[in-house]
């Protein structure tokens, strides 16, 4: 049984930087419940990094991530950086290197949260959107 996990933390940009500390708190609480220790290694890879260095991550970025047990990635994107830069400079390389092809997004209406859909209540909206990244890209040829 693994009692210590090494996790790569990539907050990214904008909302990623805002929500990741809370996500870390949640994961730390869950880990303590199961007597796990989390060893966080933070990487400053973002669109702001791209603006400073010309790259979303260093050339040896995958080598830096490989020893980790998991990658916890926030959000990337910046008004002055084209979306394809963060996509092909960070997200796609990580997904491909570590065979991460499923993006699972739960959609659930919680009690006490206003809903713009008429007459919907908790339990009426409860499903998952599953995006599979399996098709080759034009950049693969």
Where are these regions (language model features)?
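Contiguous, glycine/small-aliphatic-enriched amphipathic segments in soluble metabolic enzymes
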Residues: 1-126
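Conserved small/polar residues in nucleotide/adenosyl-binding loops
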Residues: 133-140
């Amino acid at each position: 049984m693994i009692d210590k996990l090494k996790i790569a933390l990539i907050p990214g940009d904008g909302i990623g930087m805002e929500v990741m500390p809370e996500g870390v708190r949640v994961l730390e609480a869950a880990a303590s419940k199961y007597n796990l220790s989390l060893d966080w290694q933070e990487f400053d890879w973002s669109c702001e990094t791209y603006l400073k260095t010309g790259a979303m991550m260093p050339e040896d970025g995958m080598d830096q991530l490989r020893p980790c047990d998991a990658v916890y990635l926030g959000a990337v994107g910046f008004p002055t950086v084209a979306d394809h830069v963060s996509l092909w400079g960070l997200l796609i390389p990580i997904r491909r290197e570590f065979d991460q092809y499923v993006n699972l997004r739960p959609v659930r209406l919680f009690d006490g949260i206003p809903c713009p859909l008429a007459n919907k209540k908790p339990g009426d909206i409860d499903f998952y959107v599953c995006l599979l990244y399996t098709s080759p890209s034009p950049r693969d040829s």
